[in-house]
Amino acid sequence: MAMEDIVGIIFEDIEEVKPILSDSEGNDLEGNDLSEAILEYGISEGKFLCVDYGGEEGSEIINYIMDYEFSHGIELATQEELEELDEMEYDDLTDKIKEVNKILEKAGYGLFCFPTGSDFYELFIAKLEDKEKLLEEKIVDDEELPLEERYIQYYV
């Protein structure tokens, strides 16, 4: 699968993001340049939630889910489920992400982690029907990163 396909899944409208797929001279971006452009665009457009590995400040993940629900006109979790997630105590952020995914999967969605090679998780919501496509493409080409951290992650 090409990165353009992954971009289309993450951002849902490939026409919207075509400008980030090339440089100012019209040359297609590749490798780490492309993944960096995707990250920057995703953050600027609110498609990615940037969370420190140390954990959330406040209710960042819950607010992100609620914003996604509002902008897409869908319900991914009940108010009760969101409140339980908000009150959850955890030592590792991936533990909370796993709990979020247990809830979102009921609606056919998941919370995925875009690789960064930094001290932050870049999270995004996508349909589970696209899970295999999202997980198969190497996103970051950095030999210093463990192999699994070069791919989009889905924690269960």
Model-identified regions with their sequence ranges:
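Contiguous interface-forming segments/domains that mediate binding rather than catalysis
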Residues: M1-V156
